[in-house]
Amino acid sequence: CWFPWC
């Protein structure tokens, strides 16, 4: 993922 919440 490219997001911290993935």
UniProtKB/Swiss-Prot annotation:
TM ranges: none
Signal peptide residue numbers: none
Residues recorded as bearing Cysteine amide in the entry: C6
Record flagged with keyword Transport: no
Tissues with expression: Expressed by the venom duct.
GO cellular component, one term: extracellular region
GO molecular function, one term: toxin activity
4-hydroxyproline modifications at: P4
Record keywords, A-Z: Amidation, Disulfide bond, Hydroxylation, Ion channel impairing toxin, Secreted, Toxin
Compartments it resides in: Secreted
The keyword Secreted is annotated on this UniProt entry: yes
Superkingdom of this protein's organism: Eukaryota
Disulfide cross-links: C1-C6
UniProt note: domains: The cysteine framework is C-C.
Function: Its target is unknown, but this toxin may modulate voltage-activated calcium channels (Cav) or calcium-dependent potassium channels (KCa).
Family classification: Belongs to the O2 superfamily. Contryphan family.
Name used for this protein in its record: Contryphan Co838/Co854
